[in-house]
Each structure stands twice: as structure tokens, then as C-alpha cells.
């Protein structure tokens, strides 16, 4: 069976993401995500999307959507932002922790984008990002340049097709070198609460101990 992947266009709908002049992150991410997906589909991957139009879903909804779909990988595409305009430029990728195939995929994507002309700012661990900590599968969040950097926006606009190819090839190169999808291992339920706050407190304790924990809501319980 082919690998399956869920692509997430960051933000959307009432959430524009970062905004610079007339430019909105949600528009750049949707256009780029669809272009990346088209390339991956042409290479035989089973591609699913959190959104294909300008609609809003919370990060939690996106993570649960990926989990329910049972995909092998999750890649979220964003544009970065900095408090001062034109102060920083470059690409970086975020992962839950710097280990496993997700780290390799993040590094491959960054290197492909660096070849186009972006500054490679590396891979950073962000264990508190919802789409990284609540997805069951290896997940990467890619920041494709700073939206308030004229240098990065010029690269984005003038090399759009190459950027889509770079992200797609970074993913494909990773999969080609890893014929086996990382085993999800065994999952253990450690609690069931009617009060979401109690479940959230336990979640934070588990995450602090480096367990890849997440909350499942159903039957009026938080597990």
C-alpha cells in the first residue's frame, strides 16, 4: 500500500494567521499546500487535506482529523513572522522532539528549500504545539519563510513551483530512505475524566515526562 499523508494548510477562515501589508498567511499556505499535494499524488501517495478552501478548523480538530484518518504522516505548512518587519528571513521546521523519521523529514525539507535560496534556520523542537503533540503519527510543521520579510516573499512568489517541489521532494526522499513506517507501538489509556481540566492536567504531566500523550473525547468523557 502507498504511504498516506495529511497535509495541513495553516490557519484559514476567521484565522488569517500572520498578516503583512495585504498578504495573509492563510492564503499562501492553502495555495502551497494544494500544490505540494498535487506533486505527492502524482508520485503515488495517498494525500488527504485538513482543508482545501478558506475555512477554519482549530489545531485540535486538525490533529484529531489526522488521527481518525489513520494516515502515516502529518505535514503542516505555515509562513513565519517576526515582531520587526524585514529583520529576519529563512525557513525552519518544527517537530515534537528531534528524533526519528520526523526529524529526518524536517531536515530534508529544509535542505531542499535552502537550495532554492532560503536561509536554513534549522529544525526546532516544539512539544507544546497542538498539531505536533496530539497527532499519533510523525508530524512536521514547516515555516516557509517570513511573511513580513520582503526577501522571503520575493522568493516565495518568484519560485512558487520550485518551493512546492522542494517540500514534496523532501517528503519523498525521506520515505524512499525509510521503507517501513515507524511503528506506533502500543497505546495505553491512563485516565478517564468528565472534567476536561483534570484530563488536561494529566496530559501536561505526561508530556513533561516525554510521553507522546493526547486526549480523546467521546461518550462525555476525556481519556
What are these regions (language model features)?
Residues 3-22:
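Short glycine-rich His-centered loop
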Residues 11, 51, 81, 146, ...:
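A mature extracytoplasmic/lumenal domain signature
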Residues 15-18, 150-152, 223:
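A short acidic, helix-capping loop that chelates divalent metal ions and anchors anionic groups
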Residues 19, 52, 188-189:
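Short, flexible active-site loop motifs that bind/organize anionic cofactors or intermediates
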Residues 122-125, 160, 173, 179-223:
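Acidic/polar low-complexity segments and flexible, solvent-exposed patches
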Amino acid at each position: 500500500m502507498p504511504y498516506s499523508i495529511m497535509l495541513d494548510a495553516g490557519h484559514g477562515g476567521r484565522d488569517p494567521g500572520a498578516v503583512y501589508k495585504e498578504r495573509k498567511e492563510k492564503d499562501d499556505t492553502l495555495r502551497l499546500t494544494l500544490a505540494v499535494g498535487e506533486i505527492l499524488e502524482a508520485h503515488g501517495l495517498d494525500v488527504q487535506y485538513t482543508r482545501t478552501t478558506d475555512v477554519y478548523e482549530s489545531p485540535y480538530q486538525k490533529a484529531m482529523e489526522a488521527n481518525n484518518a489513520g494516515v502515516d504522516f502529518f505535514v503542516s505548512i505555515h509562513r513565519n513572522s517576526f515582531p520587526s518587519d524585514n529583520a529576519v528571513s529563512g525557513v525552519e521546521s518544527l517537530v515534537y522532539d528531534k528524533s526519528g523519521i520526523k526529524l529526518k523529514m524536517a531536515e530534508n525539507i529544509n535542505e531542499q528549500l535552502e537550495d532554492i535560496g532560503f536561509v536554513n534556520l534549522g529544525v526546532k523542537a516544539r512539544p507544546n504545539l497542538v498539531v505536533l503533540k496530539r497527532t499519533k503519527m510523525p508530524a512536521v510543521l514547516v515555516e516557509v519563510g517570513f511573511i513580513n520579510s520582503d526577501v522571503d516573499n520575493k522568493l516565495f512568489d518568484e519560485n512558487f513551483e520550485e518551493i512546492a517541489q522542494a517540500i514534496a521532494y523532501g517528503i519523498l526522499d525521506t520515505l524512499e530512505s525509510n521503507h517501513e513506517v515507524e511503528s506506533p507501538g502500543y497505546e495505553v489509556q491512563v485516565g478517564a475524566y468528565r472534567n476536561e481540566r483534570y484530563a488536561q492536567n494529566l496530559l501536561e504531566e505526561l508530556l513533561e515526562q516525554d510521553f507522546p500523550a493526547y486526549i480523546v473525547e467521546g461518550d462525555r468523557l476525556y481519556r
